[in-house]
Amino acid sequence: MARQCELTGKKANNGYTVSHSHRRTKCLQKANLQTKRIWSPTLKRWLKLQVSTKVIKDLKRKSIDALLKI
């Protein structure tokens, strides 16, 4: 399974680690993903998804069905 949010598609970002002398080395900035069990009222079952923490925050305001339509 790829390290990617299953709802938003967020994934790792390529970036640089910059030292004090301004030497740059490549690094991979991974998305903050968590495995979460989410109840879907329309499907009437639990969904086990790997989602970003932003989605978890949005789930407190909206239902999973509203987020899936986006």
UniProtKB/Swiss-Prot annotation:
The keyword Ribonucleoprotein applies. GO terms for molecular function: structural constituent of ribosome. Keywords: Cyanelle, Plastid, Ribonucleoprotein, Ribosomal protein. Its main location: plastid. One of its GO terms (cellular component) is cyanelle. One of its GO terms (biological process) is translation. Belongs to the bacterial ribosomal protein bL28 family. This is Large ribosomal subunit protein bL28c. It comes from Cyanophora paradoxa. The gene is rpl28.
